[in-house]
Amino acid sequence: MKTLVLSIALALIAATGHAEDVTARSGGPSESAMLARNSEAAPDGMAFFRPVLSGVLYRSGFKGGDKGRTGMSGAQRTELCESGFSTAFYADFGKNTEFGRTSCGSGSLNYAAARSSRPSDVMKTVYDTIKDAGKGPVLVHCMWGVHSSGALSAMALVQFCGWSETRAKAYWNEARNGAPCGDSCDAWIDAKFDRFEVNPALKITDAERAAICPK
């Protein structure tokens, strides 16, 4: 009987832990989590699913890439929705993607296009999520999960956590897992940051920063 009770308890933890893991604003992700190859919270078929700001911002891509540029499947959107996400952005590559809202038992997920060279919409959405403790996290993904999603994530770390551009670019470089960038990876990320400026209107409190930012 004791074994049966333990098995049921573990099953309940597994069933509920997914949502709790992605929505908890628990003091900022560890470096190892930010650079992990993937996470147990990743929807099936997605890769490099990593926290950026605890309970607020995650990043990812697709296993094998998204060569058709069709974006997340209905099942992936529903899985994100059920786990507590409120918003997802496809950065740069979603030309054949049908964006829109997905409803689920726990709420809804809005799926929209984004550009790593025009980050203001993503930053504003992340800010609104930080300010609303009841709002589920944002996922920003790209084709592979290394370049464009990483650039927007690095910008968010500068905007909300006070990171220097140098530190943020170093994070982007390490998190791309050696993926090529054409002629120069430094030139690629520099060009993205040339289009980014910290927005003073999106300032957050020290307490909010302590709850979500990596140390």
Question: What are the residue ranges of the model-derived segments?
Answer:
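Bacterial N-terminal signal peptides
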Residues: 5-13
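Cys-dependent protein tyrosine phosphatase-like superfamily
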Residues: 18-140, 144, 151-215
